[in-house]
Design a protein with these regions (language model features):
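Short N-terminal or domain-adjacent regulatory/targeting segments
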Residues: 1-11, 30-35
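Alpha/beta enzyme core
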Residues: 15, 19, 26-203, 208-249, ...
Length: 256
């Protein structure tokens, strides 16, 4: 299987380079909005475009991905809410396993059903341990998954969950407070997790200020994902990207 994007993510982590990803929900954008998001992402040097959502109820996924690929060279990574959210036109797929919940369907059940189709897609598959954290309000992902999120103040639960995911073979850990969360994941929780895993750490949900994106990276996040805030104000793309990319690169330096 291909591993181009994952190798890039792993190398960036090794070097201490932070990445910024814009999350695009196909249900919430038309061609005009999509063009604007892509144009702003190119100008802001966005690293990745994530496409998907907890509920994609339209059949626009393929059209959305093809439109993006035609317009730019930014890698497109699928962020599926269900096995049906697959487009062969993307570059890679976050193959999400909800390791923070106790719903067997989202841990492995749906993957058994989707595996043949995922393999046939030709996409780069990135096994991802998905950890939902309480963002202070009910979210679509928590409702759909019927799973209790990790309490916002229980850093040790998040840490042990991420460690277990890594030891089970997950190549990425994605911690998410959910779209439109009132309370983003704390820096202390991010640091607790980042200090105990070696795979790249993705953080999303409730990030509305560039300063928070910066602080998350300083705490140990490798990739910052923002979607809801950008849907409301697309001009935030540059500010968020600049904040993430301004984090000093400290690892991988020869200090001898």
């Amino acid at each position: 299987m291909k591993s181009i994007i994952y190798q890039q993510l792993a190398e960036k982590k090794k070097q201490g380079q932070k990445s910024f990803a814009v999350l695009i929900d196909p249900d919430k954008v038309d061609a005009g909005v999509l063009d604007e998001l892509v144009e702003l992402s190119i100008a802001a040097k966005v690293d990745y475009l994530l496409v998907g959502g907890s509920l994609v109820i339209s059949n626009h996924l393929d059209d959305c991905v093809r439109h993006i690929k035609k317009s730019c060279d930014i890698p497109v990574i699928l962020f599926p809410g269900s096995p049906s959210q697959i487009s062969k036109y993307a570059d890679a797929l976050l193959y999400l396993s909800l390791i923070s919940g106790r719903n067997p369907e989202l841990l492995i059940g749906q993957h058994v059903v989707s595996a043949p189709f995922v393999r046939q897609s030709g996409l780069e598959i990135m096994p991802t341990g998905y950890v939902v954290v309480d963002g202070g309000a009910p979210t679509t992902v928590s409702y759909i998954s019927n799973a209790t999120p990790v309490p916002a103040d229980k850093n040790e639960i998040a840490m042990c969950t991420a460690m277990a995911g890594e030891m089970l073979g997950m190549k990425l850990i994605y911690m998410d407070a959910g779209s439109g969360a009132k309370r983003p994941i704390s820096e202390s929780m991010i640091k607790s997790v980042a200090d105990h895993i070696e795979v790249p750490l993705i953080i999303g949900g409730g990030i509305v200020h560039p300063e928070k994106a910066y602080l998350n990276c300083k705490a140990g996040a490798d990739v910052i994902v923002v979607g809801n805030a950008i849907e409301k104000d697309a001009s935030l793309i540059r500010e968020m990207s600049d904040a993430v990319h301004s984090v000093p690169v400290l690892k991988g330096l020869d200090v001898s």
